[in-house]
Structure formats: C-alpha cells, structure tokens
Amino acid sequence: GSRQVRLVGGPGRCAGRVEVSTSGTWSTVCQDRWDLQDAAVVCRELGCGTALEAAGSARFGPGTGALWSYVIDCAGTEESLWECPRSERRECERGA
C-alpha cells in the first residue's frame, strides 16, 4: 500500500498531530525524540514550507487510533518522512 503522512487536529493542514498511513490505516507517531528536524521533513513533504516548531507533548491531542511505534530520527534534509532512519520502540508516548 502507499505510505502517507498528514497533520490532524490543528488549525489548518500545515499544523497538527503527525499521523502516518502504511496500509490504509492511520496511526499516531511517537513523540519520543520528535524534534524540529523531523518536523522540517514533514512540512517539506506536505508542501508547507519551513517548520516553525515541533510541538510534541500531544499539544494537538494524543490521537485515539493505532500507534506507529517507531522513534524517527531525521537529519532534516530528507524529502519524505519514509527516508528518515527509525527504530522500533515497544513503548512510546503518542502525540508528536
């Protein structure tokens, strides 16, 4: 299936909680180690320009669906979140 990323729960399409879809099911991204480099890649991928902040702390709500239990570690130069290194986490805090 196609891999997608979106922002939900914010004031517009370029702000909100990060969710990813790997097989048609949307999942909330872990906020563990989520930073401005990760946010920069999502903003670039969505055509939203420069990332202003990496809110974290479930500012836009923790999400209610599935949890994508990977910690993402982008350099900030990637074109897509799917190009970023990631490591699986058994437990993580939802809501980047």
Describe the function of each predicted region:
Residues G1-A96:
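Intrinsic disorder and flexible/low-complexity segments
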